[in-house]
């Protein structure tokens, strides 16, 4: 089902008395507030959408233009592939041509880890409590892939960029439990001098996977960052300073398994 209307009144009429007819997932969103003015086109087989990722005044990752302000409406183009699921819902995924560009093998060595809460067996890491793994420095254009298996639907985990062993602040994309088997991507400035949760740039609510497995792929191109999870979640943000810096995977109080860590670049 899709909403169609030639005028605003016609569009409103299509939604009258429709309680229960439309799925609540995604709340009508395809991406974060850092993707705007999207247009779509087809290659005859697949449909794609491209739009803009806004810049941040003063290159400040926390100055996202939260309500009542507005983001800095300028920036760089971001493209996604539109995915239509069996129930008719739409999500966004990676564009094959963009993915293929990240062809060079990068380094994914563990440079540091939390003093407690990290074990490793056969290339799979288990993080327990407030734990992290810090990986080697990224390039300028990066593709980061890994799989997270949580012990429950309420275990919290995330990825941090611009992070070192003694950073006063760094920037985290966190898969946060929202209760009732729901999740949401939050953006936080962590560290001793960090502001914590950044309002106005969190993602949309989505269902936790039944098997608690999250296949995460992150693309960075200079300061533009796009995250995909399970072909079901897309999240775009602008994160200055991620180039040539280390990155980490984190747990927050629960137990998560990290496997298949891979870094590519061009």
Spans of features found by a protein language model:
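Beta-strand-rich interaction surfaces with strong enrichment in secreted/lumenal proteins
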Residues: 25-28, 131-137, 159, 201-208, ...
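Short, aromatic/His-centered strand-loop micro-motif at the edge of beta-sheets
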Residues: 191-215
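Short tryptophan-centered beta-strand motifs in secreted/extracellular beta-sheet-rich domains
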Residues: 144-146, 211-229
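Ligand-recognition surfaces built from glycine- and aromatic
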Residues: 2-8, 239-266
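Beta-propeller and closely related beta-sheet repeat lectin domains
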Residues: 36-39
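Beta-rich carbohydrate-recognition and catalytic domains
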Residues: 1-31, 53-113, 222, 232-233, ...
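Secretory/extracellular carbohydrate-interaction modules
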Residues: 122-191
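Entry beta-strands of beta-propeller and related beta-repeat scaffolds
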Residues: 46-49, 90
